[in-house]
Swiss-Prot record:
Signal peptide region: none
Gene encoding the protein: der
Alphabetically ordered keywords of this record: GTP-binding, Nucleotide-binding, Repeat, Ribosome biogenesis
Organism from which the protein derives: Persephonella marina (strain DSM 14350 / EX-H1)
Matching CDD domains: EngA1, EngA2
Described purpose of this protein according to its UniProt entry: GTPase that plays an essential role in the late steps of ribosome biogenesis.
Annotated protein name in UniProt: GTPase Der
Keyword Nucleotide-binding: yes
């Protein structure tokens, strides 16, 4: 999604303008320099176009404020992530050295910059904007974020400069999903793979009843757990009660419970018995993970039941990876729930996978990555004509979803899209997250 960062020195009204643009009070606003310390991200809609808005912390020249280097780093990071910038300055106070310093940083990029001269709430005050042309940007607007004055003109200019493909992509965007502090984790797997034992090993207590009989956990088990300041809500899928009056068989209910859990969870932990390796039923479960594009961690459990030799463990791991080849992004962790081995590594992987599933990349970064990948391998021709990818953008929400504008969507075959997907994961840092590619047809312009 097109990303616009609001930058400026402390106490010029960045957060007030941010709240005005998104239409709700999300950033804390006080008359104290530097109240907003962290970047706050939200979506906005103007003239039917949806885009992302970032409220950065106030840029501070002096390092006397302990937050100054951090805030400066946040702004400089936005130079890469954002597609455009609104530089907010104070029309009453006038041009300052700090404003010039921020402008100097913004001139490093060739991306659009709009200067919002804030605290101008009537036409008589508009003459105050002229000195700000000294910053070297053409688009300077008098605004009052409190009184709404001039904000419409500013947003009209921003939206007018959004590329056509980003406007089209914004039509695909639904409600923005907020990242939760709690990771919902579904532990899935065929009966007796060790799901409840694994949960107990994580919790360090006998929370779920365990025996050697498949499906012995009868009650719903939703358990909140915290590790290294990260909260997890574990959903032990074996805990959903089986219908007592209808005997459809264990596998029927196992798959049914798994499907519900996969839809609900943020991260799936797919537990596989080390003695059996990946079975046909494990393949069915993994296909559900793939179908719903869910982040996942594959756990090869019960390694205490196989010879503790590296060649044996590698053979098991390779068998699982080969059979579940269609979810290559899911990291594999080898555990012994009985001996509590591999538990810390599992929790780390769950956290990494979750964070990657929320990762966003800027439009420029994405298109540079695609250009780099296409230099390695061009898409095949279609009906004698070359297939082309004109540009791409990341849509809102998770899992990461990229909309590609191409000339012939039907010509892009699965093997090439898989090549593109795998390389995008590597280049953009989504190695542990599933990504989706959507294709939209677009005619090539002829000038």
């Amino acid at each position: 999604m097109y990303r616009v960062a609001i930058v400026g020195r402390p106490n010029v009204g960045k957060s007030s303008l941010f709240n005005r643009i998104i239409g709700k009070r999300k950033a804390i606003v006080e008359d104290i320099p530097g109240v907003t310390r962290d970047r706050i991200v939200s979506t906005a809609e103007w003239r039917g176009v949806t885009f992302e808005v970032v409220d950065t912390g106030g840029y501070i020249e002096s390092d006397k404020d302990t937050f100054a280097p951090y805030i400066r780093k946040q702004i400089e990071k936005e130079l890469e992530l954002s597609d455009a910038f609104i530089l907010v300055v104070d029309g009453k106070e006038g041009l300052t050295p700090a404003d010039k310093e921020i402008a100097r940083i913004l001139h490093r990029t060739d991306k659009p910059v709009y200067v919002a001269v804030n605290k101008i709430d009537n036409p008589e005050m508009e003459k105050a904007i002229y000195e700000f042309y000294e910053l070297g940007f053409e688009k300077v607007f008098p605004v009052s974020s409190i009184q709404k004055y001039g904000v419409a003109d500013l947003l009209d200019a921003v939206v007018q400069d959004i590329p056509e493909y980003e406007r089209e992509a914004s039509k695909e965007v639904g409600e923005k999903e907020e990242k939760s502090d709690v990771i919902k984790v579904a532990i899935v797997g065929k009966p007796n793979a060790g799901k409840s034992s694994l949960l107990n090993a994580i919790l360090g207590e006998e929370r779920a009843v365990v025996s050697e009989i498949p499906g012995t956990t009868r009650d719903v088990v939703d358990t909140l757990f915290e590790w290294k300041d990260q909260k997890f809500l574990f959903l032990d899928t074996a805990g959903l009660r089986k219908k007592s009056k209808v005997d459809y068989g264990i596998e029927f209910f196992s798959i049914g419970r798994t499907l519900d859990a996969i839809k609900k969870a943020d991260v799936i932990v797919h537990v596989i018995d080390a003695q059996q390796g990946a079975t046909e039923q494990d393949t069915k479960i993994a296909h559900l993970i793939q179908k719903y594009t869910k982040p996942a961690v594959i756990v090869i459990n019960k390694i205490d039941t196989v010879p503790p030799k590296s060649e044996v463990l590698n053979r098991i791991k390779n068998q699982v990876r080969e059979r579940l080849y269609f979810i290559p992004y899911a990291p594999i962790v080898m555990t012994s729930a009985k001996n509590r081995k591999g538990i810390k590594q599992l929790l780390k992987e769950i956290t990494d996978v979750y964070n990657q599933s929320w990762k966003r990349v800027g439009t420029g970064q994405l298109n540079r990555a695609i250009k780099q990948i296409l230099s390695l391998r061009q898409p095949p021709s279609y009906h004698g004509k070359p297939l082309k990818i004109y540009y791409a953008t990341q849509l809102e929400g998770k899992p990461p979803c990229f909309l590609l504008f191409v000339n012939h969507p039907e010509g892009f075959k699965e093997h090439f899209l898989r090549f593109l997907e795998n390389n995008l994961r590597t280049v953009l840092g989504f190695e542990k997250a599933p990504i989706k590619l959507l294709l939209r047809g677009k005619e090539e312009r002829r000038d």
